[in-house]
C-alpha cells in the first residue's frame, strides 16, 4: 500500500467476498479510512450495506451491513419461516408486495431456475446469513458451501477468517470433502505468502493446524490441507469453492491427501 498515494480518496467500499477483520484493521491503520462493506448479487442492486453518513449505523467490520431501503428482506429457515436474531437462515427478499426495484424478473430461457429462485412470495438469494440484535446481517456462506460434519454445520468463511490470521496464509478456501464416518470433513486450500512458499509443506500444515486448534473449535479444524499457487475464481474475483469440491468429489480421503 505504501506504493500508492491514497490521500485524495475519501471513501472506500467493498463487496463480492466477505471481508475479514485483519484486512479491515490494517486498512484503517494505514489509511485512516474505514471500508464500507456491502452485499448484492448480479441479479440485484445493493441488498445490504454499511451505508455512509448514517450516524446511528456505525461500520461493523465483517458484516454485510443493514438492509437497503429498496428491499424488504427476511431470513428464512428451510420451511420458509422467519428465524430469530442470531440463527442462521437463507437471505430472501419479499416479492409478494410488488416487484422490488433493481431485482431480476427471471432467468433467460430457464423456467426451472426462475421457479426455484422465486418461490413462496420470496426471491431466494441462496446465501445463508444471520442477523444480530442491532439489525446487521452477517454472511455465513452459500447454501451449497456449508459443510456438514458429524452433525455440525460449519461456515467456510468463519474457518477461512481464522486461518487468514496466520502470517503464512495469503488467502484460502475452505470446503467439505465426503467422508463415510462424518459425512464431510473440512479441507483448507491455501495460498502462502511469498516468504513461506519454500518452506516444507508438512511443517506448514502442522503449524497452521496448531494455530487453528488454538483459535477455533475442534470440529471446525481442517483435516486436509492443500497448498496451491492460486485459487479458482470467477471473473469478478469470487472464490469458486464449487470447483475445488468437484475436483475432490468421489475421491478416497487418503488418495486426496497423497495427491498433495
Ranges and model annotations:
Residues 1-58, 72, 82:
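Gly/Ser/Thr-rich phosphate-binding loop
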Residues 8, 32, 70, 168-171, ...:
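Glycine-centered tight turns that cap/initiate beta-strands
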Residues 16, 40, 65, 127, ...:
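Active-site glycine-centered loops adjacent to acidic/histidine catalytic or metal-binding residues
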Residues 18, 50-51, 57-109, 116-117:
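Adenylate-forming AMP-binding core of the ANL superfamily, especially NRPS adenylation
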Residues 36-43, 63-67, 175-178:
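Beta-strand->loop->alpha-helix junctions that form or flank phosphate-binding loops
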Residues 73, 79, 95, 99-100, ...:
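AMP-binding/adenylate-forming catalytic core of the ANL superfamily
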Residues 190, 238-260:
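Phosphopantetheine-dependent thiolation modules in NRPS/PKS and related acyl-activating systems
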Residues 214-238, 255-260:
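AMP-binding/adenylate-forming catalytic domain of the ANL superfamily
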Amino acid at each position: 500500500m505504501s506504493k500508492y498515494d491514497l490521500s485524495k480518496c475519501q471513501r472506500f467500499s467493498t463487496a463480492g467476498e466477505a471481508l475479514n477483520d485483519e484486512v479491515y484493521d490494517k486498512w484503517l491503520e494505514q489509511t485512516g479510512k474505514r471500508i464500507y462493506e456491502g452485499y448484492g448479487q448480479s441479479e440485484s442492486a445493493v441488498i445490504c450495506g454499511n451505508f455512509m453518513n448514517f450516524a446511528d449505523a456505525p461500520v461493523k467490520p465483517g458484516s454485510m451491513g443493514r438492509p437497503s431501503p429498496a428491499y424488504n428482506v427476511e431470513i428464512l429457515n428451510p420451511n420458509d419461516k422467519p428465524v430469530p436474531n442470531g440463527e442462521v437462515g437463507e437471505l430472501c427478499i419479499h416479492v409478494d408486495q410488488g416487484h422490488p426495484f433493481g431485482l431480476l424478473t427471471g432467468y433467460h430461457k430457464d423456467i426451472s431456475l426462475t421457479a426455484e429462485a422465486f418461490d413462496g412470495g420470496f426471491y431466494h438469494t441462496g446465501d445463508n446469513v444471520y442477523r444480530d440484535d442491532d439489525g446487521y446481517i452477517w454472511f455465513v456462506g452459500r447454501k451449497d458451501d456449508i459443510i456438514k460434519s458429524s452433525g455440525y454445520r460449519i461456515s467456510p468463511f468463519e474457518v477461512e477468517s481464522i486461518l487468514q490470521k496466520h502470517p503464512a496464509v495469503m488467502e484460502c478456501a475452505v470446503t467439505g470433502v465426503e467422508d463415510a464416518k462424518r459425512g464431510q470433513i473440512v479441507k483448507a486450500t491455501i495460498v502462502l505468502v511469498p516468504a513461506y512458499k519454500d518452506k516444507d509443506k508438512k511443517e506448514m500444515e502442522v503449524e497452521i493446524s496448531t494455530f487453528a486448534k488454538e483459535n477455533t473449535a475442534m470440529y471446525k479444524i481442517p483435516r486436509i490441507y492443500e497448498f496451491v499457487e492460486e485459487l479458482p475464481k470467477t471473473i469478478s474475483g469470487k472464490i469458486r469453492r464449487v470447483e475445488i469440491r468437484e475436483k475432490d468429489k468421489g475421491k478416497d480421503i487418503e488418495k486426496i491427501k497423497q495427491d498433495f
